[in-house]
Amino acid sequence: RRFLHTRRNKNLVENKNVYTSSKYIIDDPELDAIDGGLGLAPMETDRAGDEGSPLSFTLSVLDIPGATVETFHPKAVHLYGNTLYVANDAPGHYSLEVFDVSSGNVRHVKSMVEWMNGDKKETFAGEPNGVTRSYGKIYVTNTGSRTDVFDAETYEFITCIGTGTWGEGGYQTVHAFDVTASQGAVFIRDKRKLVVVLEQDVQPGSAARVPIYSRSVNLQEAMGTYAVAARNDGFLYVTAQNKNMIYLFDPADIRAGDTGFAPYLVALGFEKSPQSIAFVGDRLFVTLRVDDKRSELWEISPKNGKLLQDFTDSMVYPEKIAGARHTLLVVDRATQTVKAIGL
Protein backbone atom coordinates (compact mmCIF):
# COMPACT_ATOMS: atom_id res chain seq x y z
CA ARG A 1 0.00 0.00 0.00
CA ARG A 2 2.75 2.44 0.92
CA PHE A 3 4.45 2.34 -2.49
CA LEU A 4 1.59 4.32 -3.96
CA HIS A 5 2.70 7.40 -2.00
CA THR A 6 6.17 8.19 -3.30
CA ARG A 7 8.73 6.69 -5.57
CA ARG A 8 12.18 7.81 -6.64
CA ASN A 9 12.09 8.06 -10.41
CA LYS A 10 15.28 6.71 -11.99
CA ASN A 11 14.08 7.53 -15.51
CA LEU A 12 14.28 11.25 -14.88
CA VAL A 13 13.23 13.84 -17.42
CA GLU A 14 15.92 16.53 -17.33
CA ASN A 15 15.59 18.81 -14.28
CA LYS A 16 12.19 17.45 -13.27
CA ASN A 17 11.54 16.18 -9.77
CA VAL A 18 13.38 13.00 -8.86
CA TYR A 19 11.05 12.45 -5.93
CA THR A 20 7.47 12.42 -7.15
CA SER A 21 4.29 12.09 -5.12
CA SER A 22 1.41 9.84 -5.98
CA LYS A 23 -1.88 11.46 -6.87
CA TYR A 24 -3.48 9.21 -4.27
CA ILE A 25 -1.65 9.40 -0.94
CA ILE A 26 -2.49 6.71 1.57
CA ASP A 27 -2.55 7.72 5.23
CA ASP A 28 -2.55 4.47 7.15
CA PRO A 29 -2.25 4.52 10.98
CA GLU A 30 -1.23 0.86 11.02
CA LEU A 31 1.69 1.44 8.68
CA ASP A 32 2.53 4.73 10.39
CA ALA A 33 3.12 2.80 13.60
CA ILE A 34 5.56 0.53 11.76
CA ASP A 35 7.55 2.90 9.55
CA GLY A 36 7.01 6.29 11.17
CA GLY A 37 4.53 7.56 8.62
CA LEU A 38 4.83 9.32 5.31
CA GLY A 39 7.20 12.04 6.50
CA LEU A 40 10.97 12.02 6.58
CA ALA A 41 12.36 8.84 8.09
CA PRO A 42 13.99 10.21 11.28
CA MET A 43 17.71 9.55 11.48
CA GLU A 44 20.35 10.49 14.02
CA THR A 45 21.47 14.13 14.01
CA ASP A 46 25.23 14.74 14.11
CA ARG A 47 25.76 16.26 17.56
CA ALA A 48 29.50 15.63 17.90
CA GLY A 49 30.21 19.27 17.10
CA ASP A 50 28.33 20.38 20.20
CA GLU A 51 30.84 18.78 22.57
CA GLY A 52 33.14 21.06 24.54
CA SER A 53 33.16 23.85 27.09
CA PRO A 54 31.91 27.41 26.47
CA LEU A 55 34.13 29.80 24.52
CA SER A 56 34.71 33.54 24.74
CA PHE A 57 36.64 35.48 22.09
CA THR A 58 36.35 38.15 19.42
CA LEU A 59 37.61 37.35 15.92
CA SER A 60 38.63 40.13 13.54
CA VAL A 61 40.61 40.71 10.36
CA LEU A 62 43.76 40.69 12.51
CA ASP A 63 43.31 36.93 13.00
CA ILE A 64 43.78 36.18 9.28
CA PRO A 65 47.32 36.54 7.91
CA GLY A 66 47.43 38.98 5.00
CA ALA A 67 43.77 39.96 5.22
CA THR A 68 42.55 43.56 5.19
CA VAL A 69 39.27 45.30 5.96
CA GLU A 70 38.61 45.22 2.21
CA THR A 71 39.19 41.46 1.85
CA PHE A 72 37.43 40.14 4.98
CA HIS A 73 33.74 40.77 5.63
CA PRO A 74 32.38 38.00 7.89
CA LYS A 75 28.83 37.06 6.93
CA ALA A 76 28.00 33.73 8.57
CA VAL A 77 29.55 31.49 11.20
CA HIS A 78 29.39 27.88 12.38
CA LEU A 79 31.17 26.15 15.26
CA TYR A 80 31.79 22.40 15.18
CA GLY A 81 33.82 21.16 18.13
CA ASN A 82 37.20 22.89 17.96
CA THR A 83 36.71 24.13 14.39
CA LEU A 84 35.19 27.49 13.52
CA TYR A 85 33.95 28.27 10.01
CA VAL A 86 33.36 31.85 8.83
CA ALA A 87 31.81 32.66 5.45
CA ASN A 88 33.42 35.79 3.97
CA ASP A 89 31.42 37.83 1.45
CA ALA A 90 33.90 40.65 0.78
CA PRO A 91 33.36 41.66 -2.88
CA GLY A 92 35.94 39.97 -5.09
CA HIS A 93 37.31 37.96 -2.17
CA TYR A 94 34.65 35.33 -1.41
CA SER A 95 35.97 32.58 0.85
CA LEU A 96 35.33 30.20 3.70
CA GLU A 97 37.79 30.88 6.51
CA VAL A 98 38.63 28.01 8.87
CA PHE A 99 39.97 28.45 12.40
CA ASP A 100 41.09 26.20 15.26
CA VAL A 101 39.77 27.15 18.71
CA SER A 102 41.06 24.18 20.71
CA SER A 103 43.20 26.42 22.93
CA GLY A 104 40.33 28.79 23.61
CA ASN A 105 41.92 31.33 21.29
CA VAL A 106 41.49 31.71 17.53
CA ARG A 107 44.14 30.28 15.18
CA HIS A 108 43.70 30.57 11.41
CA VAL A 109 43.96 27.23 9.60
CA LYS A 110 42.84 27.69 6.02
CA SER A 111 41.26 30.02 3.46
CA MET A 112 39.00 28.16 1.03
CA VAL A 113 38.87 30.39 -2.03
CA GLU A 114 38.90 27.97 -4.96
CA TRP A 115 38.80 24.22 -5.56
CA MET A 116 38.77 21.59 -8.28
CA ASN A 117 35.48 20.10 -9.44
CA GLY A 118 36.88 17.29 -11.56
CA ASP A 119 39.22 19.03 -13.98
CA LYS A 120 37.49 22.41 -13.56
CA LYS A 121 38.64 25.11 -11.14
CA GLU A 122 35.74 26.75 -9.30
CA THR A 123 35.04 29.52 -6.79
CA PHE A 124 31.89 30.56 -4.94
CA ALA A 125 29.29 31.49 -7.57
CA GLY A 126 27.78 34.20 -5.37
CA GLU A 127 28.06 35.79 -1.95
CA PRO A 128 28.67 33.06 0.67
CA ASN A 129 26.00 33.55 3.33
CA GLY A 130 25.48 30.34 5.33
CA VAL A 131 27.57 27.43 6.59
CA THR A 132 27.06 24.23 8.54
CA ARG A 133 28.75 20.87 9.04
CA SER A 134 27.26 17.40 9.39
CA TYR A 135 28.79 13.92 9.27
CA GLY A 136 32.09 14.93 7.71
CA LYS A 137 30.64 17.38 5.17
CA ILE A 138 30.79 21.20 5.16
CA TYR A 139 27.87 22.95 3.43
CA VAL A 140 28.22 26.57 2.23
CA THR A 141 25.26 28.40 0.69
CA ASN A 142 25.66 31.32 -1.69
CA THR A 143 23.45 33.70 -3.65
CA GLY A 144 24.55 32.04 -6.90
CA SER A 145 21.90 29.32 -6.38
CA ARG A 146 24.41 26.76 -5.13
CA THR A 147 25.27 25.08 -1.88
CA ASP A 148 28.83 23.80 -2.20
CA VAL A 149 29.78 20.73 -0.18
CA PHE A 150 33.33 19.96 0.99
CA ASP A 151 35.07 17.16 2.87
CA ALA A 152 35.58 18.33 6.46
CA GLU A 153 38.95 16.59 6.74
CA THR A 154 40.59 17.21 3.36
CA TYR A 155 38.61 20.34 2.33
CA GLU A 156 38.22 18.83 -1.12
CA PHE A 157 35.06 19.53 -3.11
CA ILE A 158 32.47 16.73 -2.90
CA THR A 159 29.47 18.07 -4.78
CA CYS A 160 27.03 20.98 -4.93
CA ILE A 161 23.30 21.29 -4.32
CA GLY A 162 21.76 23.53 -6.95
CA THR A 163 22.81 24.08 -10.54
CA GLY A 164 24.03 27.67 -10.31
CA THR A 165 20.89 28.80 -12.15
CA TRP A 166 17.90 29.71 -10.02
CA GLY A 167 14.66 27.81 -10.39
CA GLU A 168 12.51 25.05 -8.94
CA GLY A 169 13.52 22.14 -11.12
CA GLY A 170 14.49 18.78 -9.67
CA TYR A 171 18.03 19.94 -8.84
CA GLN A 172 17.57 23.69 -8.33
CA THR A 173 17.22 26.26 -5.57
CA VAL A 174 16.22 29.91 -5.90
CA HIS A 175 19.50 31.41 -4.70
CA ALA A 176 20.45 30.03 -1.25
CA PHE A 177 20.68 31.96 2.01
CA ASP A 178 21.23 29.54 4.88
CA VAL A 179 21.62 25.85 5.64
CA THR A 180 21.36 23.41 8.53
CA ALA A 181 21.28 19.63 8.85
CA SER A 182 19.05 17.59 11.14
CA GLN A 183 17.73 14.02 11.39
CA GLY A 184 19.27 12.87 8.10
CA ALA A 185 18.21 15.85 5.98
CA VAL A 186 19.78 19.09 4.77
CA PHE A 187 17.52 22.14 4.98
CA ILE A 188 18.25 25.13 2.74
CA ARG A 189 16.44 28.44 3.11
CA ASP A 190 16.30 29.85 -0.40
CA LYS A 191 14.68 33.07 -1.63
CA ARG A 192 11.20 31.56 -1.68
CA LYS A 193 10.98 28.37 0.30
CA LEU A 194 12.52 25.87 2.68
CA VAL A 195 14.20 23.25 0.49
CA VAL A 196 14.87 19.69 1.70
CA VAL A 197 17.64 17.35 0.51
CA LEU A 198 18.39 13.92 1.97
CA GLU A 199 21.92 13.62 3.37
CA GLN A 200 22.21 10.19 1.76
CA ASP A 201 21.81 11.83 -1.67
CA VAL A 202 24.78 14.17 -1.12
CA GLN A 203 27.45 12.03 -2.76
CA PRO A 204 30.61 12.55 -4.85
CA GLY A 205 30.02 12.78 -8.58
CA SER A 206 26.57 14.32 -8.22
CA ALA A 207 27.54 17.98 -8.71
CA ALA A 208 24.52 20.04 -9.77
CA ARG A 209 22.45 16.84 -9.77
CA VAL A 210 21.66 16.31 -6.09
CA PRO A 211 17.89 15.66 -6.09
CA ILE A 212 15.59 17.98 -4.20
CA TYR A 213 13.44 15.85 -1.89
CA SER A 214 10.79 18.44 -1.06
CA ARG A 215 9.97 22.16 -0.79
CA SER A 216 7.71 24.16 1.49
CA VAL A 217 4.97 26.49 0.37
CA ASN A 218 6.15 29.91 -0.82
CA LEU A 219 7.10 32.03 2.20
CA GLN A 220 6.97 35.19 0.06
CA GLU A 221 9.87 35.93 -2.24
CA ALA A 222 12.40 38.63 -1.37
CA MET A 223 16.15 39.14 -1.21
CA GLY A 224 17.56 39.60 2.28
CA THR A 225 19.15 37.83 5.22
CA TYR A 226 17.51 34.56 6.22
CA ALA A 227 18.14 31.65 8.53
CA VAL A 228 16.99 28.15 9.37
CA ALA A 229 17.67 26.41 12.69
CA ALA A 230 16.69 23.04 14.12
CA ARG A 231 15.41 22.52 17.64
CA ASN A 232 16.71 19.50 19.54
CA ASP A 233 13.52 17.57 18.77
CA GLY A 234 13.85 18.29 15.02
CA PHE A 235 11.34 21.14 14.73
CA LEU A 236 12.58 23.74 12.25
CA TYR A 237 12.52 27.52 12.74
CA VAL A 238 12.73 29.60 9.55
CA THR A 239 12.95 33.39 9.29
CA ALA A 240 10.88 35.48 6.89
CA GLN A 241 12.20 38.97 7.52
CA ASN A 242 9.96 40.60 4.91
CA LYS A 243 6.93 39.35 6.88
CA ASN A 244 8.40 39.92 10.38
CA MET A 245 7.84 36.24 11.12
CA ILE A 246 9.59 33.09 12.23
CA TYR A 247 7.81 30.05 10.83
CA LEU A 248 7.91 26.65 12.51
CA PHE A 249 7.92 23.41 10.54
CA ASP A 250 7.24 19.95 11.89
CA PRO A 251 9.48 17.47 10.00
CA ALA A 252 6.65 14.93 10.26
CA ASP A 253 4.65 17.14 7.87
CA ILE A 254 7.29 17.04 5.14
CA ARG A 255 6.31 14.90 2.16
CA ALA A 256 8.43 13.90 -0.80
CA GLY A 257 7.78 15.70 -4.04
CA ASP A 258 6.84 19.24 -4.96
CA THR A 259 3.50 19.41 -3.14
CA GLY A 260 4.54 22.30 -0.87
CA PHE A 261 4.50 21.39 2.82
CA ALA A 262 3.03 24.06 5.09
CA PRO A 263 4.34 25.67 8.29
CA TYR A 264 3.17 24.50 11.69
CA LEU A 265 0.05 26.20 13.04
CA VAL A 266 2.11 28.33 15.44
CA ALA A 267 4.34 31.14 14.10
CA LEU A 268 6.33 33.80 15.97
CA GLY A 269 5.59 37.41 15.01
CA PHE A 270 7.67 40.53 15.67
CA GLU A 271 7.46 44.30 15.24
CA LYS A 272 10.95 44.22 13.71
CA SER A 273 12.39 41.97 11.01
CA PRO A 274 14.03 38.72 12.21
CA GLN A 275 17.22 38.03 10.28
CA SER A 276 18.99 35.11 11.90
CA ILE A 277 18.17 32.54 14.57
CA ALA A 278 20.18 30.02 16.56
CA PHE A 279 19.65 27.48 19.29
CA VAL A 280 22.16 27.05 22.10
CA GLY A 281 20.85 23.93 23.75
CA ASP A 282 17.15 24.68 24.25
CA ARG A 283 17.67 28.46 24.29
CA LEU A 284 16.62 30.40 21.19
CA PHE A 285 18.29 33.60 19.97
CA VAL A 286 17.29 35.97 17.18
CA THR A 287 18.70 39.09 15.53
CA LEU A 288 16.15 41.77 14.68
CA ARG A 289 16.78 44.47 12.10
CA VAL A 290 16.08 48.01 13.33
CA ASP A 291 17.32 49.90 10.25
CA ASP A 292 20.23 49.88 7.80
CA LYS A 293 22.73 50.63 10.56
CA ARG A 294 21.37 48.92 13.65
CA SER A 295 19.99 45.58 14.77
CA GLU A 296 19.34 43.85 18.07
CA LEU A 297 20.19 40.46 19.57
CA TRP A 298 17.54 38.88 21.77
CA GLU A 299 16.99 35.64 23.59
CA ILE A 300 13.35 34.74 23.05
CA SER A 301 10.90 32.08 24.11
CA PRO A 302 10.82 29.23 21.55
CA LYS A 303 7.09 28.90 22.28
CA ASN A 304 5.82 32.44 21.72
CA GLY A 305 8.78 34.61 20.66
CA LYS A 306 8.60 36.88 23.70
CA LEU A 307 11.76 38.68 24.79
CA LEU A 308 13.59 36.93 27.62
CA GLN A 309 16.86 38.88 27.58
CA ASP A 310 18.47 41.58 25.42
CA PHE A 311 22.03 40.61 24.44
CA THR A 312 22.69 43.54 22.10
CA ASP A 313 24.99 45.21 24.63
CA SER A 314 27.97 46.81 22.83
CA MET A 315 27.19 45.27 19.44
CA VAL A 316 26.11 47.56 16.62
CA TYR A 317 24.70 45.36 13.85
CA PRO A 318 24.52 41.71 14.96
CA GLU A 319 23.28 39.73 11.97
CA LYS A 320 23.98 36.01 11.34
CA ILE A 321 24.35 33.90 14.50
CA ALA A 322 25.05 30.27 15.39
CA GLY A 323 25.22 28.14 18.51
CA ALA A 324 27.27 25.19 19.78
CA ARG A 325 29.27 24.15 22.87
CA HIS A 326 27.14 26.34 25.19
CA THR A 327 28.38 29.26 23.08
CA LEU A 328 26.55 31.83 20.97
CA LEU A 329 28.49 33.03 17.90
CA VAL A 330 27.54 36.48 16.59
CA VAL A 331 28.62 38.23 13.39
CA ASP A 332 28.61 42.00 13.84
CA ARG A 333 28.45 43.45 10.34
CA ALA A 334 29.20 46.98 11.54
CA THR A 335 32.51 46.08 13.20
CA GLN A 336 33.30 43.13 10.87
CA THR A 337 33.91 40.84 13.83
CA VAL A 338 32.72 37.47 15.14
CA LYS A 339 32.03 37.39 18.86
CA ALA A 340 31.79 34.20 20.92
CA ILE A 341 29.63 34.50 24.04
CA GLY A 342 29.86 31.67 26.57
CA LEU A 343 26.51 30.84 28.14
Show where each model-derived region lies.
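N-terminal secretory leader/proregion of peptide precursors and effectors
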Residues: R1-A48
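Surface-exposed loop and turn segments in beta-propeller and other repeat-based domains
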Residues: E44-V69, H108-T123, I158-Y171, A208-E221, ...
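Beta-rich, blade/repeat-based domains predominating
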Residues: T68-Y80, W115-R133, T165-A181, L219-N232, ...
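Conserved core beta-strand positions within WD40 beta-propeller blades
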Residues: T83, K137, A185, F235, ...
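Conserved beta-strand positions in repeat-built beta-propeller and related beta-rich domains
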Residues: V86-G92, V140-S145, I188-R192, V238-K243, ...
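Structural motif
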Residues: H93-E97, R146-V149, L194-L198, N244-D250, ...
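Short loop/turn segments that connect beta-strands within beta-propeller blades
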Residues: D100-N105, D151-Y155, E199-P204, D250-R255, ...
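Blade-level signature of beta-propeller repeat domains, shared across WD40, Kelch, NHL, RCC1
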Residues: Y317-L343
